[in-house]
Amino acid sequence: MSLPLFALAALAEIAGCFAFWHVVRAGGSPLWLAPGVLSLVAFAALLTQVEADAAGRAFAAYGGIYILASLGWMWAAEGVRPDRFDALGAAICLAGACVILFAPRG
């Protein structure tokens, strides 16, 4: 099952992007960039391990997981609680990701 890999990839991507955000937008130390780059490399490596017959399909399905994980990060790390529109948007995206992941293909 690809779901645990998608979740780990999302955590790695968000952590890596947040490191850059912290340096550029919040004035954080440039030392944040090293773990940020490592996290982004881990993200790419993890995404290559998911079960998919095409890279584009893996990336598209991952998008729904990424959106949900991003909202979780926003709440847990940034202290901003998602509102009902965030939740609705995430639900729609997850439904789309499920169609991509679980559709019967012949």
From Swiss-Prot:
GO terms for cellular component: plasma membrane. The chain crosses the membrane at residues 4-24, 27-47, 58-78, 84-104. It is found in: Cell inner membrane. Belongs to the UPF0060 family. The keyword Cell inner membrane applies. Pfam families: UPF0060. It is a multi-pass membrane protein. It comes from Azorhizobium caulinodans (strain ATCC 43989 / DSM 5975 / JCM 20966 / LMG 6465 / NBRC 14845 / NCIMB 13405 / ORS 571). InterPro entries: UPF0060 (IPR003844). SUPFAM superfamilies: Multidrug resistance efflux transporter EmrE. This is UPF0060 membrane protein AZC_0909. Keywords: Cell inner membrane, Cell membrane, Membrane, Transmembrane, Transmembrane helix. The keyword Cell membrane applies.
